[in-house]
Amino acid sequence: MQIILLEKVVNLGNLGDVVRVKDGYARNFLIPNKQARRATASAIQEFEARRAELEKLAAERLAAAQAEGEKLNGLTLQLSQKAGVDGRLFGSVTNHDIAAALTAQGFKVEKAQVRMPNGPLKTVGDHPVAVSLHTDVSVDVTVSVLGETV
């Protein structure tokens, strides 16, 4: 299916690109999430008329994400969990826990934006975690897991 991208999509293209994707990906993900539109002749003309407005909105979102990223970059987040004597946690610290802690501090972060390359944190100590605020803005946050002995 031919689609017009209404915003930058990772591994696919930028705003305004006409790309070919599988029908299910377009119908079930890109179009419902307002990231793309079916590329018909009328849709292409309408997009070209609104192109400046959409580019302005994309630039505003990027600027807002960069401002949020400057506040968030280098932040150390402290979370406490029950742990054994050897420093292993009973349970783990997931991206949901980190997103909830950042939201409690006043940042708008969803759990899908928290990137944990090694999976959930299962030991006490400092762990680097990436937070992706925008497709072009990613910041590093240090999560300090404190152990509560049982």
Swiss-Prot record:
Single GO molecular function: rRNA binding
GN (gene name): rplI
Family classification: Belongs to the bacterial ribosomal protein bL9 family.
Annotated protein name in UniProt: Large ribosomal subunit protein bL9
Stored InterPro entries: Ribosomal_bL9, Ribosomal_bL9/RNase_H1_N, Ribosomal_bL9_bac/chp, Ribosomal_bL9_C, Ribosomal_bL9_C_sf, Ribosomal_bL9_N, Ribosomal_bL9_N_sf
PANTHER family documented for this protein: 50S RIBOSOMAL PROTEIN L9
GO biological process: translation
Membrane-spanning intervals of the chain: none
